[in-house]
Amino acid sequence: MKGSPISQFSKTSINALTRPWKKYRDGELFYGLSKVGNKRVPLTTKQGNKTMYKGTRASGIGRHTKFGGYVINWKKVRTYVTPDMVNFELKPYVNANVPPLKHEFKGFSGGPLDPRLQLLKIKEYIVNGRVQSEGATDTSCYKERG
């Protein structure tokens, strides 16, 4: 059977593009350029793998620059007002009388970064294991709770 020329089906070139025998359900003509349904919907966390995290756009405090940096918009940064501490009823978890830990590096010119001090600390760790500092073992300033 010989195929019929297209001029017998349509009168103009625009009508040649349409397929009047294929229509959408609402009556629009189908031009063959789209597929059924929208395939470009946003990806959800249920569709991604276990490492996918989208977030909720809750903490966007700035913007990315085109050079890979990040500029913070200080109007979007959260600020918290602390209450006045005079006659404040809530108490801290840590006792206010706890002495601060002070590290002394006598005989080491580089302070905490001196290689001789690091070597000495490694030797002590090998011999004794992990040992708390003297200030941390002072239990006289501890307050028993409960």
Curated annotation (Swiss-Prot):
Residues 1-16 form a transit peptide. It comes from the Eukaryota. Coiled coil: none annotated. Pfam families: MRP-L27. It is found in: Mitochondrion. One of its GO terms (cellular component) is mitochondrion. One of its GO terms (molecular function) is structural constituent of ribosome. The keyword Ribonucleoprotein applies. Belongs to the mitochondrion-specific ribosomal protein mL41 family. PANTHER family: LARGE RIBOSOMAL SUBUNIT PROTEIN ML41, MITOCHONDRIAL RIBOSOMAL PROTEIN L41. This is Large ribosomal subunit protein mL41. It comes from Saccharomyces cerevisiae (strain ATCC 204508 / S288c) (Baker's yeast).
